[in-house]
Design a protein with these regions (language model features):
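Metal-cofactor-binding active-site regions of metalloenzymes
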Residues: 23-264
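Hydrophobic helical h-region of N-terminal Sec-dependent signal peptides
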Residues: 11-15
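Bacterial N-terminal signal peptides that target proteins for export
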Residues: 1-10
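N-terminal signal peptide c-region/cleavage motif recognized by signal peptidases
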Residues: 16-20
Length: 264
Protein backbone atom coordinates (compact mmCIF):
# COMPACT_ATOMS: atom_id res chain seq x y z
CA UNK A 1 0.00 0.00 0.00
CA UNK A 2 1.14 3.55 -0.72
CA UNK A 3 0.61 4.68 2.86
CA UNK A 4 2.58 1.77 4.33
CA UNK A 5 5.47 2.18 1.91
CA UNK A 6 5.78 5.89 2.72
CA UNK A 7 5.70 5.20 6.45
CA UNK A 8 8.43 2.59 6.02
CA UNK A 9 10.51 5.09 4.10
CA UNK A 10 10.18 7.67 6.86
CA UNK A 11 10.75 5.14 9.64
CA UNK A 12 13.86 3.67 8.07
CA UNK A 13 15.46 7.12 7.87
CA UNK A 14 14.49 7.96 11.44
CA UNK A 15 15.90 4.70 12.83
CA UNK A 16 19.29 5.18 11.28
CA UNK A 17 19.50 8.96 11.35
CA UNK A 18 22.67 8.77 13.44
CA UNK A 19 24.51 7.16 10.57
CA UNK A 20 24.92 9.63 7.73
CA UNK A 21 26.44 6.95 5.56
CA UNK A 22 23.35 4.75 5.87
CA UNK A 23 20.68 7.42 5.32
CA UNK A 24 20.89 10.00 2.57
CA UNK A 25 20.38 13.66 3.45
CA UNK A 26 16.74 14.68 3.44
CA UNK A 27 17.27 16.87 0.40
CA UNK A 28 18.52 13.87 -1.61
CA UNK A 29 15.87 11.30 -0.79
CA UNK A 30 13.06 13.82 -0.93
CA UNK A 31 14.18 15.11 -4.32
CA UNK A 32 14.31 11.55 -5.62
CA UNK A 33 10.95 10.70 -4.13
CA UNK A 34 9.39 13.90 -5.51
CA UNK A 35 10.67 13.13 -8.99
CA UNK A 36 9.78 9.43 -9.01
CA UNK A 37 6.53 9.28 -7.02
CA UNK A 38 3.15 9.08 -8.67
CA UNK A 39 0.65 11.91 -8.04
CA UNK A 40 -1.22 9.58 -5.69
CA UNK A 41 1.94 8.83 -3.69
CA UNK A 42 2.79 12.52 -3.43
CA UNK A 43 -0.73 13.31 -2.24
CA UNK A 44 -0.66 10.67 0.49
CA UNK A 45 2.83 11.69 1.57
CA UNK A 46 1.93 15.36 1.94
CA UNK A 47 -1.39 14.49 3.59
CA UNK A 48 0.42 12.60 6.36
CA UNK A 49 3.12 15.20 7.01
CA UNK A 50 2.65 17.59 9.94
CA UNK A 51 1.59 20.95 8.55
CA UNK A 52 3.81 23.96 9.13
CA UNK A 53 3.37 27.69 9.50
CA UNK A 54 2.92 28.23 5.78
CA UNK A 55 -0.69 27.06 6.12
CA UNK A 56 -3.21 29.63 7.22
CA UNK A 57 -6.94 29.90 7.68
CA UNK A 58 -9.17 32.73 6.44
CA UNK A 59 -12.38 32.79 8.46
CA UNK A 60 -14.36 34.44 5.67
CA UNK A 61 -13.67 31.55 3.31
CA UNK A 62 -14.11 28.76 5.87
CA UNK A 63 -17.89 28.73 6.21
CA UNK A 64 -20.52 26.52 4.66
CA UNK A 65 -23.26 28.05 2.51
CA UNK A 66 -25.86 26.75 4.94
CA UNK A 67 -24.23 28.65 7.82
CA UNK A 68 -24.34 31.92 5.91
CA UNK A 69 -27.99 31.42 4.96
CA UNK A 70 -29.02 30.37 8.46
CA UNK A 71 -27.60 33.56 9.99
CA UNK A 72 -28.71 35.84 7.15
CA UNK A 73 -32.40 35.09 7.71
CA UNK A 74 -32.37 35.29 11.53
CA UNK A 75 -32.21 38.93 12.73
CA UNK A 76 -32.48 37.70 16.32
CA UNK A 77 -29.09 36.00 15.89
CA UNK A 78 -27.31 38.33 13.47
CA UNK A 79 -27.71 41.61 15.35
CA UNK A 80 -30.99 42.76 13.82
CA UNK A 81 -29.80 42.91 10.21
CA UNK A 82 -32.03 42.10 7.24
CA UNK A 83 -30.43 40.94 4.00
CA UNK A 84 -31.48 41.10 0.36
CA UNK A 85 -29.94 39.25 -2.57
CA UNK A 86 -30.11 39.88 -6.32
CA UNK A 87 -32.33 37.32 -8.05
CA UNK A 88 -32.84 39.04 -11.42
CA UNK A 89 -30.82 41.44 -13.59
CA UNK A 90 -32.63 44.41 -15.12
CA UNK A 91 -29.58 46.36 -16.36
CA UNK A 92 -30.76 49.37 -14.39
CA UNK A 93 -27.58 51.28 -15.19
CA UNK A 94 -27.62 50.49 -18.89
CA UNK A 95 -24.79 49.06 -20.97
CA UNK A 96 -21.06 49.67 -20.68
CA UNK A 97 -20.80 49.62 -16.89
CA UNK A 98 -17.69 48.44 -15.03
CA UNK A 99 -18.20 44.70 -14.59
CA UNK A 100 -14.74 44.16 -13.12
CA UNK A 101 -15.17 45.98 -9.82
CA UNK A 102 -16.50 44.49 -6.59
CA UNK A 103 -20.12 45.37 -7.41
CA UNK A 104 -20.85 44.50 -11.06
CA UNK A 105 -24.49 44.95 -12.00
CA UNK A 106 -24.49 41.57 -13.77
CA UNK A 107 -23.53 39.57 -10.66
CA UNK A 108 -26.36 37.34 -9.49
CA UNK A 109 -26.92 36.76 -5.76
CA UNK A 110 -24.96 39.76 -4.59
CA UNK A 111 -26.14 40.21 -1.00
CA UNK A 112 -26.71 43.56 0.73
CA UNK A 113 -28.04 44.65 4.10
CA UNK A 114 -31.18 46.75 4.50
CA UNK A 115 -29.34 50.05 5.01
CA UNK A 116 -27.72 49.68 1.58
CA UNK A 117 -30.92 48.37 0.01
CA UNK A 118 -32.63 51.61 1.02
CA UNK A 119 -30.13 53.64 -1.03
CA UNK A 120 -30.98 51.86 -4.31
CA UNK A 121 -33.15 53.22 -7.09
CA UNK A 122 -36.57 51.63 -7.59
CA UNK A 123 -35.23 49.74 -10.60
CA UNK A 124 -32.30 48.40 -8.59
CA UNK A 125 -34.57 47.43 -5.70
CA UNK A 126 -36.66 45.37 -8.12
CA UNK A 127 -33.64 43.11 -8.71
CA UNK A 128 -33.38 42.15 -5.04
CA UNK A 129 -35.45 39.94 -2.78
CA UNK A 130 -35.46 39.62 1.00
CA UNK A 131 -33.49 36.50 1.80
CA UNK A 132 -36.08 34.95 4.08
CA UNK A 133 -38.60 35.26 1.22
CA UNK A 134 -36.61 33.29 -1.36
CA UNK A 135 -38.48 30.38 -2.91
CA UNK A 136 -36.88 26.93 -2.97
CA UNK A 137 -35.33 27.39 -6.40
CA UNK A 138 -33.84 30.76 -5.45
CA UNK A 139 -32.58 29.50 -2.11
CA UNK A 140 -30.88 26.50 -3.74
CA UNK A 141 -29.29 28.74 -6.36
CA UNK A 142 -28.08 31.16 -3.68
CA UNK A 143 -26.51 28.32 -1.68
CA UNK A 144 -24.80 27.00 -4.81
CA UNK A 145 -23.57 30.47 -5.74
CA UNK A 146 -20.99 30.30 -2.94
CA UNK A 147 -19.96 26.71 -3.57
CA UNK A 148 -17.55 25.33 -6.15
CA UNK A 149 -20.05 22.77 -7.40
CA UNK A 150 -19.49 22.83 -11.16
CA UNK A 151 -16.64 21.45 -13.24
CA UNK A 152 -15.82 24.85 -14.76
CA UNK A 153 -15.59 26.61 -11.39
CA UNK A 154 -12.26 27.11 -9.66
CA UNK A 155 -9.92 29.77 -8.34
CA UNK A 156 -11.44 32.63 -10.34
CA UNK A 157 -14.97 31.77 -9.23
CA UNK A 158 -13.87 31.59 -5.59
CA UNK A 159 -11.84 34.79 -5.40
CA UNK A 160 -13.66 36.94 -7.94
CA UNK A 161 -17.28 35.94 -7.31
CA UNK A 162 -17.83 34.39 -3.88
CA UNK A 163 -16.56 37.36 -1.89
CA UNK A 164 -18.51 39.82 -4.03
CA UNK A 165 -21.68 37.78 -3.56
CA UNK A 166 -21.34 37.53 0.22
CA UNK A 167 -20.59 41.26 0.30
CA UNK A 168 -22.40 42.80 3.31
CA UNK A 169 -22.84 39.43 5.02
CA UNK A 170 -19.07 39.30 5.39
CA UNK A 171 -19.00 42.74 7.02
CA UNK A 172 -21.29 41.87 9.93
CA UNK A 173 -19.08 41.26 13.00
CA UNK A 174 -21.86 39.47 14.88
CA UNK A 175 -22.13 36.94 12.06
CA UNK A 176 -18.33 36.72 12.01
CA UNK A 177 -18.30 35.90 15.73
CA UNK A 178 -20.92 33.19 15.18
CA UNK A 179 -18.82 31.78 12.34
CA UNK A 180 -15.79 31.53 14.62
CA UNK A 181 -17.81 29.41 17.04
CA UNK A 182 -19.28 27.29 14.24
CA UNK A 183 -15.75 26.57 13.01
CA UNK A 184 -14.64 25.69 16.54
CA UNK A 185 -17.54 23.26 16.90
CA UNK A 186 -16.96 21.65 13.50
CA UNK A 187 -13.22 21.31 14.02
CA UNK A 188 -13.71 19.93 17.54
CA UNK A 189 -15.66 17.05 16.03
CA UNK A 190 -12.56 16.24 13.96
CA UNK A 191 -10.28 16.26 17.00
CA UNK A 192 -8.74 19.71 16.46
CA UNK A 193 -7.54 21.43 19.63
CA UNK A 194 -6.06 24.69 18.28
CA UNK A 195 -7.36 27.13 15.67
CA UNK A 196 -5.66 30.31 14.50
CA UNK A 197 -7.66 32.17 11.90
CA UNK A 198 -7.31 35.44 9.99
CA UNK A 199 -10.02 38.05 10.16
CA UNK A 200 -10.10 41.84 10.01
CA UNK A 201 -11.66 43.91 12.77
CA UNK A 202 -11.92 46.92 10.44
CA UNK A 203 -14.58 48.05 7.95
CA UNK A 204 -17.39 46.19 9.72
CA UNK A 205 -20.89 47.56 9.21
CA UNK A 206 -23.49 48.31 11.85
CA UNK A 207 -27.10 47.66 10.92
CA UNK A 208 -27.63 51.36 10.18
CA UNK A 209 -24.72 51.38 7.73
CA UNK A 210 -22.21 53.16 9.96
CA UNK A 211 -18.83 51.55 10.62
CA UNK A 212 -17.66 49.84 13.81
CA UNK A 213 -14.29 50.74 15.28
CA UNK A 214 -11.73 47.96 15.46
CA UNK A 215 -11.94 47.85 19.26
CA UNK A 216 -15.73 47.55 19.15
CA UNK A 217 -15.43 44.52 16.87
CA UNK A 218 -12.84 42.87 19.09
CA UNK A 219 -15.12 43.39 22.10
CA UNK A 220 -17.93 41.63 20.20
CA UNK A 221 -15.61 38.71 19.47
CA UNK A 222 -14.53 38.50 23.12
CA UNK A 223 -18.12 38.47 24.34
CA UNK A 224 -19.07 35.66 21.97
CA UNK A 225 -16.01 33.52 22.66
CA UNK A 226 -16.59 33.58 26.42
CA UNK A 227 -20.02 31.97 26.07
CA UNK A 228 -20.41 28.38 27.18
CA UNK A 229 -20.90 26.76 23.76
CA UNK A 230 -17.61 28.23 22.55
CA UNK A 231 -15.66 27.20 25.64
CA UNK A 232 -17.28 23.76 25.60
CA UNK A 233 -15.63 22.94 22.25
CA UNK A 234 -12.25 22.66 23.96
CA UNK A 235 -10.66 24.39 20.96
CA UNK A 236 -8.13 27.08 21.82
CA UNK A 237 -8.70 29.87 19.30
CA UNK A 238 -6.58 32.87 18.43
CA UNK A 239 -7.30 35.54 15.84
CA UNK A 240 -4.89 37.22 13.45
CA UNK A 241 -5.61 40.70 12.12
CA UNK A 242 -5.40 40.32 8.34
CA UNK A 243 -3.88 42.71 5.82
CA UNK A 244 -4.21 42.91 2.05
CA UNK A 245 -0.56 43.39 1.15
CA UNK A 246 -1.14 44.67 -2.38
CA UNK A 247 -3.68 47.38 -1.48
CA UNK A 248 -2.57 50.98 -2.19
CA UNK A 249 -2.71 51.86 1.53
CA UNK A 250 -1.10 48.64 2.80
CA UNK A 251 1.60 50.41 4.82
CA UNK A 252 -0.87 52.64 6.64
CA UNK A 253 -3.11 49.64 7.29
CA UNK A 254 -0.16 47.74 8.71
CA UNK A 255 0.51 50.56 11.19
CA UNK A 256 -3.16 50.58 12.10
CA UNK A 257 -3.08 46.80 12.63
CA UNK A 258 -0.12 47.06 14.99
CA UNK A 259 -1.83 49.79 17.00
CA UNK A 260 -4.95 47.64 17.30
CA UNK A 261 -2.99 44.54 18.31
CA UNK A 262 -0.95 46.53 20.84
CA UNK A 263 -4.08 47.88 22.52
CA UNK A 264 -5.62 44.41 22.82
Amino acid sequence: MVKVSILRLLTSCLLIVSSAAMCKPASDWFSNFKNDATPEQLYHFLYMLPKGGDLHNHLGGSNFSEWWYELAIQPERNGGYRYYTRTVINLCNGYGTNEFNSAPQSLMFRTIQHSNYNTLSECEKSEYRLMNELNLEQKTAWLNSIRLNKDFEGRSEFFEKHWSRLNDLGRNPIIAAEMIVKNMQAFAEEGLTYLETQISAFNRLKSDGSVYSGNEVIDLFRQRLTQYDAIDTGVTTRLQQSLLRFSPDAEENLKRNYRLADSN
